[in-house]
């Protein structure tokens, strides 16, 4: 079967090594956008349940995809830890997981820095407890069950922090034991597993390409994305975009279950959530790759944006002067792109304004077949409120640092 050429393939190996952690962080920030609208419409308790269902309904699926893509399938704690390092739920440094391996079945991790905690602490103890207890208990196990259904992730200590500056932010044990009951899959998982996103075929990694073709070697303290081959980085970037789409499909199911048949309410929440992350993602991509603040730079950001990727899932014809979006598997899933059209263009406006507030997107065509051009104007656009909400997260302005990548041996 022919596979579509990735839009990330045109980037250099160095650019991809910069972009991949950005994409992982963007995936984490999806919730900073989405959960704000869930709190305002459904309240805090329902927001917690939405978050649990959202992650539990997607992370086992995308974790398995990444294991296969990078050839590190297994059943032990090392496999669990490798998966977390390539998971939008645990972007590097912003969620600074430090791992200890005692043996194949026993390990620990602690967070030297938890960006999500620092985002939530100002909101009060109820929100901290909700995230670090109510959400994490089922979702850590759900992520681990992709590797081994008899894996239990349990807290050593976790927030609310006492004292208030306690460090590390939290610590957990990860134990696999045959005597443990199997962790159950949530019912939503079956629906998300039937999606076109989950079954998207991406080009295999070329083992002859210079650099690492997989993550079958030792577990590393920090993944050095620069050590991977160009081919592997293209695949990782596409997989991370699919992680986002699977998470959002699961989020949509959870929102729909609470909208009680109110299609307008459901669509409004989904749309606002997309606008927020669209703008924040665009700004990070533009800055990370040092793209120009003109129409050309804006079109490049659109082309590389998770909204439009991977190419095998979202069909876009790229021209020097415009992008032409066509019907694709993403439309069948009701993915992000299905929320955008000539009469619903705010996600595109958020993207181009993040590149330069004097730019506007001009969109023409039908709901599922449209063209976007970028034009210069004389008036700076005011930042959209949905983007402002997403920027509440420290992740929106996070700066990555260079780190040494060291193999972790059994203690």
Where in the sequence are the language-model features?
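N-terminal accessory segment detector
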Residues: 1-108, 115-135, 141, 145, ...
């Amino acid at each position: 079967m022919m596979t579509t050429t990735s839009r990330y393939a045109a980037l250099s190996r160095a650019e991809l090594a910069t972009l991949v952690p950005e994409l992982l962080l963007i995936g984490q920030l999806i919730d900073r956008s989405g959960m704000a609208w869930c709190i305002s419409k459904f309240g805090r308790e329902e927001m917690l349940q939405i978050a649990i269902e959202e992650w539990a309904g997607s992370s086992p699926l995308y974790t398995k995809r990444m294991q296969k893509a990078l050839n590190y399938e297994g059943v032990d704690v090392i496999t669990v830890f490798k998966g977390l390092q390539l998971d939008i739920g645990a972007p590097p440094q912003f969620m600074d997981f430090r791992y200890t391996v005692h043996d194949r079945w026993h390990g620990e991790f602690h967070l030297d820095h938890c960006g999500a905690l620092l985002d939530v602490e100002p909101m009060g103890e109820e929100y901290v407890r909700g995230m670090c207890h109510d959400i994490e208990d089922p979702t850590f196990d759900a992520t681990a069950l992709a590797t081994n259904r008899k894996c239990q992730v349990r807290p050593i200590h976790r927030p609310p922090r006492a004292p208030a500056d306690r460090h590390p932010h939290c610590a957990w044990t990860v134990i696999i034991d045959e005597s443990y009951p199997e962790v159950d899959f949530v019912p939503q998982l079956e629906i998300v597993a039937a999606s076109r996103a989950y079954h998207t075929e991406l080009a295999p990694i070329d083992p002859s390409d210079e650099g690492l073709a997989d993550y079958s070697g030792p577990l590393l303290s920090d993944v050095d994305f620069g050590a991977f081959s160009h081919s592997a980085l293209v695949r990782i970037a596409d997989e991370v975009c699919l992680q986002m789409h699977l998470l959002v499909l699961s989020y949509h199911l959870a929102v729909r279950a609470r909208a009680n048949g109110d299609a307008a309410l459901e669509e409004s929440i989904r749309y606002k959530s997309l606008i927020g992350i669209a703008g924040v993602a665009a700004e990070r991509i533009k800055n990370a790759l040092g793209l120009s603040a003109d129409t050309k730079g804006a079109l490049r950001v659109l082309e590389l944006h998770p909204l439009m990727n991977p190419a095998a899932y979202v069909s876009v014809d790229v021209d020097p002067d415009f992008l032409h979006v066509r019907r694709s598997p993403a439309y069948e899933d009701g993915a992000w792109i299905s929320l955008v059209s000539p009469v619903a263009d705010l996600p595109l406006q958020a993207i181009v304004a993040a590149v330069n507030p004097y730019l506007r997107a001009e969109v023409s065509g039908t709901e599922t077949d449209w063209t976007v051009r970028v034009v210069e104007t004389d008036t700076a656009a005011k930042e959209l409120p949905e983007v402002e909400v997403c920027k509440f997260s420290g992740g929106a302005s996070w700066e990555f640092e260079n780190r040494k990548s060291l193999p972790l041996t059994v203690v």
